[in-house]
């Protein structure tokens, strides 16, 4: 099986009903960085504290423009002899063009890596399923593990799951080992889990539209307010210390005539009328026919609000509780 070919699609399930599942991550992409100045360079570009990142931990982060608007939301970690991060494939080319602008002055090589396989493992007894192939499996205390050519990431939300950066051979071996035990699915299942977890999904339609706090990046420890300068720092700090941010990321669920696209508008029920509000970041339709939407909305939105996709009069979406506190 080619590393570029996704697993056969099936409609996603919520984490509470998900059997053991191997998930192809064709909608995500890997970037690797190597060289003596790699950590220093990333430290000046990303919102998180890359310099303090241990080899057994990852960090969420945003890469912003000078106005503090996100090119992308990413997950950064140690990988082989350097660093790496994973982001949505739709933003990688444009984000890399920005990231590389000043790299010519640093000893770091930045590569879009499509040779590695990105594989999700989620659902019932996912951790036990990996134990037979890997001597070291990550957990909540040590969310990153390294085993030969594979880096394994552990995500606690919405339920324990794993992301493997590996080789086609390891992917095939894992698929063979779990044949008859695990179902297969494409990246829509991983997207559904990210929506349920409240992990921001920034696709190309929403590039440079939002500051990190509008997508709850601070709630996921993806912003350091103590490190030195980085791109967009002034605006990100202003949002925290001057209360400049009025938006937050939400998980909505309900019915819609079709899953909205990234960048689509929503409407909020106000008495007998509907008022345009917010922006869709991501959406998916589940096996039971319901639709999940991740959206940026005003951060004073009432928990009992009723919304729908713009002009979808038959739709009805309600706010779902996120598994973390948003904070500032």
Curated annotation (Swiss-Prot):
This is tRNA-modifying protein YgfZ. Its main location: cytoplasm. Folate binds at residues 28, 190. The keyword Nuclease does not apply. Pfam families: YgfZ_barrel. GO terms for molecular function: folic acid binding. It comes from Sodalis glossinidius (strain morsitans). Belongs to the tRNA-modifying YgfZ family. Keywords: Cytoplasm, Folate-binding, tRNA processing. One of its GO terms (cellular component) is cytoplasm.
């Amino acid at each position: 099986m080619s590393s570029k070919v996704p697993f056969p699609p099936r409609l996603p399930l919520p984490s509470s009903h998900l059997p053991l599942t191997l998930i192809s991550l064709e909608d995500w992409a890997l970037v690797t960085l190597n060289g003596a100045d790699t950590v220093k360079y990333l430290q000046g570009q990303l919102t998180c504290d890359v310099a303090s990142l241990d080899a057994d931990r990852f960090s969420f982060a945003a890469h912003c423009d000078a106005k503090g608007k996100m090119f992308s939301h990413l997950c950064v970690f140690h990988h082989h002899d350097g660093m790496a991060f994973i982001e949505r494939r739709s933003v990688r080319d444009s984000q890399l063009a920005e990231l590389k602008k000043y790299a010519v002055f640093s000893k770091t090589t930045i590569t879009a890596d499509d040779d590695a396989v990105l594989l999700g493992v989620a659902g019932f007894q996912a951790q036990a399923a990996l134990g037979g192939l890997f001597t070291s499996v990550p957990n909540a205390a040590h969310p990153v593990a390294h085993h030969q050519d594979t880096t394994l990431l552990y995500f606690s939300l919405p339920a324990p799951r794993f992301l493997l950066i590996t080789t086609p051979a390891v992917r095939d071996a894992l698929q063979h080992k779990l044949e008859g035990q695990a179902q297969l699915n494409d990246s829509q299942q991983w997207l559904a889990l990210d929506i349920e977890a409240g992990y921001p999904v920034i696709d190309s339609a929403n590039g440079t539209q939002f500051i990190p706090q509008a997508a709850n990046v601070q709630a996921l420890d993806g912003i350091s307010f103590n490190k030195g300068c980085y791109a967009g720092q002034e605006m990100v700090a202003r949002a925290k210390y001057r209360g400049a941010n009025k938006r937050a990321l939400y998980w909505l669920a309900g019915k819609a005539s079709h899953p909205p696209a990234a960048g689509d508008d929503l409407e909020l029920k106000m008495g007998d009328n509907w008022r345009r509000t917010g922006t869709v970041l991501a959406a998916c339709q589940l096996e039971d026919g319901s639709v999940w939407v991740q959206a940026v909305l005003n951060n004073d939105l009432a928990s009992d609000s009723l919304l729908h996709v713009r002009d979808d009069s038959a739709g009805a979406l309600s706010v779902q509780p996120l598994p973390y506190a948003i904070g500032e």
